[in-house]
Amino acid sequence: MTAIAKSAAKVTCDGANTSFIISASTAALLALGRFVFLPFQRSMVSRHGLPEQNGVPTTRRVTAVRRRWWSMLKTNDPAGFTLVDVLAWGALGHAVGFFILATATNGYNGFQ
């Protein structure tokens, strides 16, 4: 007769929870960048004007090569949310998500 040992294994779904936290924080920061900070930045630029170098606005200093590169970064977003904005806010969202995961699993419980 063989004895069956009871295992103390614990089944968790950490992978799904991790994916959800990273996705939710990335989506939240993309929405924050698109609907909060982009209009704020546009209103500040319209209020204070574009930066100048030697009295010439930076929009006049754009060469043909720069125009070609800038056309690749444009999107069809009505507000003008560019590819660089998506990458930057997405990276911030990932950083916030990893911060949440790191602080949630470090074992410190300061509220006890």
Curated annotation (Swiss-Prot):
<keyword id="KW-0472">Membrane</keyword>
<dbReference type="InterPro" id="IPR017494">
    <property type="entry name" value="PSI_PsaG"/>
</dbReference>
<dbReference type="InterPro" id="IPR000549">
    <property type="entry name" value="PSI_PsaG/PsaK"/>
</dbReference>
<dbReference type="InterPro" id="IPR023618">
    <property type="entry name" value="PSI_PsaG/PsaK_dom"/>
</dbReference>
<dbReference type="GO" id="GO:0015979">
    <property type="term" value="P:photosynthesis"/>
</dbReference>
<dbReference type="GO" id="GO:0009535">
    <property type="term" value="C:chloroplast thylakoid membrane"/>
</dbReference>
<protein>
    <recommendedName>
        <fullName>Photosystem I reaction center subunit V, chloroplastic</fullName>
    </recommendedName>
</protein>
<keyword id="KW-0150">Chloroplast</keyword>
<feature type="transit peptide" description="Chloroplast">
    <location>
        <begin position="1"/>
        <end position="15"/>
    </location>
</feature>
<feature type="transmembrane region" description="Helical">
    <location>
        <begin position="81"/>
        <end position="101"/>
    </location>
</feature>
<keyword id="KW-0793">Thylakoid</keyword>
<comment type="similarity">
    <text>Belongs to the PsaG/PsaK family.</text>
</comment>
<keyword id="KW-0934">Plastid</keyword>
<keyword id="KW-0602">Photosynthesis</keyword>
<dbReference type="Pfam" id="PF01241">
    <property type="entry name" value="PSI_PSAK"/>
</dbReference>
<keyword id="KW-1133">Transmembrane helix</keyword>
<keyword id="KW-0812">Transmembrane</keyword>
<feature type="transmembrane region" description="Helical">
    <location>
        <begin position="20"/>
        <end position="40"/>
    </location>
</feature>
<dbReference type="GO" id="GO:0009522">
    <property type="term" value="C:photosystem I"/>
</dbReference>
<keyword id="KW-0809">Transit peptide</keyword>
<keyword id="KW-0603">Photosystem I</keyword>
<dbReference type="InterPro" id="IPR016370">
    <property type="entry name" value="PSI_PsaG/PsaK_pln"/>
</dbReference>
<comment type="function">
    <text>Not yet known.</text>
</comment>
